[in-house]
Amino acid sequence: SGGCVIMGTAAGPLTELAQMLNLPVTNTLMGLGGYPGADRQFLGMLGMHGSFTANLAMHHSDVILAVGARFDDRVINGAAKFCPNAKIIHIDIDPASFSKTIKADIAIVGPVDSVLTEMVAIVREIGETPNQDAQAAWWKQIDEWRGNRGLFPYDKGDGSIIKPQTV
């Protein structure tokens, strides 16, 4: 999620949709705070200043729901390599935001809070959930990435000396 989640007061419906569908969530720098950072489904910020887990999850995704994100150069790190196998659904209030740097397979124009609220209602009405076996395998992979490199990928030592990177 990007800055429009914050500006469009869409954190509530974004959180509700992600939790209903058990989806992993990443944020851009401008979108930080748009999803609870302590929630298990939050993978961290993506891009050059983001987490290893968030970047790998995005890269290996089959579908990306981009909510109010700009796809700037610090996030995509080269359009040709960005999420090569993903279908991208992009929600934004500004139609000029679509396909500037990353092609949107589906572009949804509208206020992000209204669009997400409607999506929540549709998911409730349909009553279907994602394939649980596929989703369990995906979360297992994400948890493996978290365990390997997480937010603290360095050796913390034996604890007798505090290393600068732990502060």
Predicted regions and their residues:
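Flexible loop/turn segments at secondary-structure boundaries
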Residues: 6-10, 32-36, 72-75, 96-99, ...
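Cofactor-pocket helix-loop regions in the catalytic cores of large enzyme subunits
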Residues: 1-40, 63, 120, 136-167
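Short amphipathic alpha-helical segments
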Residues: 10-13, 76-80, 101-103, 120-121
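Phosphate/pyrophosphate-binding active-site segments
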Residues: 85-167
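Phosphate/diphosphate-binding loops
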Residues: 47-98, 106
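Active-site rim loops that border cofactor/substrate pockets in soluble metabolic enzymes
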Residues: 31-50, 57
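Short glycine- and Lys/Arg-enriched binding-loop motifs that mark or flank ligand-binding interfaces
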Residues: 27-29, 40-46, 64, 101, ...
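Glycine-rich, N-terminal phosphate-binding loop of Rossmann-like dinucleotide-binding domains
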Residues: 1-2, 67-68, 111
